[in-house]
Amino acid sequence: GCVLYPWC
C-alpha cells in the first residue's frame, strides 16, 4: 500500500 503514488 503506497501513500504518495496510487500507481506503485
Curated annotation (Swiss-Prot):
**InterPro entries xref list:** Contryphan_CS
Q: Which residues carry this modification: D-leucine?
A: L4
Keywords recorded for this protein, A-Z? Amidation, D-amino acid, Disulfide bond, Hydroxylation, Ion channel impairing toxin, Neurotoxin, Secreted, Toxin
Q: What is the name of the protein in this document?
A: Contryphan-In
What is the additional note?
Exists in two forms, due to cis-trans isomerization at 5-Tyr-Pro-6.
Q: What is known of its domains?
A: The cysteine framework is C-C.
A molecular function annotated in GO for this UniProt entry is: toxin activity
PROSITE patterns in the cross-refs: CONTRYPHAN
- What does the sequence similarity comment in the record state about its family? Belongs to the O2 superfamily. Contryphan family.
Q: What is the effect of changing Y5L?
A: No change in chromatographic profile, there is no slow conformation equilibrium
Q: Does the keyword Secreted apply?
A: yes
Provide the protein's localization: Secreted
Q: Which organism is it from?
A: Conus inscriptus
Role, per record: Its target is unknown, but this toxin may modulate voltage-activated calcium channels (Cav) or calcium-dependent potassium channels (KCa).
Modified residues annotated as Cysteine amide in this record:
C8
Could you name the Gene Ontology cellular component terms for this entry?
extracellular region
